[in-house]
């Protein structure tokens, strides 16, 4: 099978979304497909050498850095120069180079429409064509412009393919942060969905919500878990006989409420590493260590020294942070903190509970404290700290192909 994967982002940038993108690519390779990738050229972006595209993939890159991004980098250069000459000056006004550039940037951003600066990928893709025929095109968002580019290619026959599946790791209009709740975004998402042959989401709750929001496309929608990117689980061990807890991921209050866990962990006196942004919401203590988002090469030693992984659900929206699938591939204890409405929590616990893999609790100080005590005592009932193979990339990709027929 010849598969073309389209993603309008630089896959060498360190992000949770990119780790999932790479896992999809690995899944297609492991499933025996001949995989081609069309993505953004890493030459224009800060890359993490640990973010490696799987071997055996034919990579085609688009130079798609936007004018907005170029001006942002130029502005940073001016700001750095200003910092060296601030003595005896006043704040920059709109007539300064800094203020003028910001004004130009704001005007330019409005020209990109609902896609924002990601629209540059679509614009540059208009120059691309491929003589190879594909059995399947997979467009993956984030960002949603991946789907727009895929449609343009297929409509104009710049790319020939038998089938097309859209994978939405996050919905657009109803994203968990609420940044895209504009009518023009809803209408464009509706249009993109109407163009697709099949649409795959990564959460049962997101599927239900999207089917209600876009009933005209409901029949073509299905859901499938994200593939796990961990390949070799690190050995589990206790340092000096104690557990070390780890929360790895962002925790902006609009999306995730980490404060109950922080408070419960502090009161319980357990050792914790929290790695992610924003890193200024909580202060470090003797046992709780706060870190910003780290490159993988710096994050790995901390992850390897952790034997209790903390997973926190989103406040609302039904989206499932992809880390739960990655953690499930390890032999480590997983503290699964439920959040959202009662109905959302019930759906998540019903699905994940069948694996007997997680120690569940609600996102309150009291219930998290109970779960921590349970873990510390070693009394976790029928929970088995064994790797699940249900989320292996090849299995997930095969299931997507079967559901997409």
Tell me what each language-model feature is.
Residues 359-404:
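A charged, aromatic-enriched C-terminal amphipathic alpha-helix characteristic of glycosyltransferases
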Residues 252-256, 297, 301, 309-328, ...:
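Nucleotide-sugar-dependent
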Residues 23, 127, 145-148, 166, ...:
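Membrane-proximal helix-turn-helix segments that form the acceptor-binding/catalytic region
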Residues 49-50, 69-71, 177-180, 222-242:
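Acidic anion/phosphate-binding donor-loop and adjacent secondary structure
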Residues 43-116, 120:
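A conserved catalytic-core segment of Leloir-type glycosyltransferases
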Residues 229-232, 238-283, 293-296:
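Conserved catalytic-core segment of nucleotide-activated headgroup transferases in glycan assembly
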Residues 1-68, 198, 259-268:
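N-terminal subdomain of nucleotide-sugar transferases
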Residues 163, 194-234:
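Donor nucleotide-sugar binding/catalytic pocket of nucleotide-sugar-dependent glycosyltransferases
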């Amino acid at each position: 099978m010849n598969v073309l994967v389209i993603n309008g982002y630089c896959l060498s940038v360190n992000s949770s979304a990119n780790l999932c993108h790479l896992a999809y690519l690995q899944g297609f390779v492991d499933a025996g497909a001949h995989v081609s990738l069309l993505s953004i050229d890493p030459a224009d972006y800060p890359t993490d050498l640990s973010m490696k595209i799987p071997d055996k993939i034919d990579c085609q890159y688009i130079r798609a850095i936007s004018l907005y991004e170029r001006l942002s980098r130029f502005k940073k250069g001016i700001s750095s120069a200003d910092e060296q000459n601030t003595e005896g000056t006043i704040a920059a006004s709109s007539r300064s180079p800094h203020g003028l550039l910001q004004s130009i940037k704001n005007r330019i951003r409005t020209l990109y429409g609902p896609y924002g600066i990601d629209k540059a990928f679509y614009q540059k893709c208009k120059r691309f064509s491929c003589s190879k025929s594909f059995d399947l095109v997979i467009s993956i968002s984030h960002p949603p412009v991946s789907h727009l580019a895929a449609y343009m290619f297929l409509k104009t026959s710049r790319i020939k393919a038998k089938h097309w599946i859209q994978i939405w790791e996050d919905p657009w209009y109803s994203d968990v942060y609420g940044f895209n709740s504009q009518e023009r975004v809803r209408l464009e998402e509706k249009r993109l969905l109407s163009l697709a042959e099949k649409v795959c989401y990564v959460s049962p709750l997101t599927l239900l919500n999207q089917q209600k929001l876009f009933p005209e496309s409901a029949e073509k929608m299905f859901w499938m878990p994200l593939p796990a990117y961990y390949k070799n689980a690190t050995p589990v061990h206790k340092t000096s006989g104690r557990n070390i807890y780890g929360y790895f991921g962002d925790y902006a209050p609009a999306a995730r409420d980490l404060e109950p866990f922080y408070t419960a962990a502090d009161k319980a006196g357990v050792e914790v590493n929290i790695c992610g942004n924003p890193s200024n919401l909580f202060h470090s203590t003797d046992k709780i260590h706060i870190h910003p988002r780290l490159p993988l090469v710096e994050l790995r030693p901390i992850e390897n020294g952790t034997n209790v992984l903390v997973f926190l659900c989103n406040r609302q929206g039904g989206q499932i942070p992809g880390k739960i699938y990655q953690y499930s591939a390890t032999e480590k204890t997983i503290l699964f903190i439920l959040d959202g409405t009662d109905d959302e929590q019930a759906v998540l616990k019903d699905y994940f509970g069948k694996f007997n893999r997680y120690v569940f609790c609600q996102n309150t100080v009291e219930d998290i404290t109970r779960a921590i005590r349970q873990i510390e005592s070693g009394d976790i009932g029928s929970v088995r700290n064994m790797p699940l193979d249900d989320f292996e990339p090849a299995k997930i990709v095969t299931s997507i192909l079967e559901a997409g027929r």
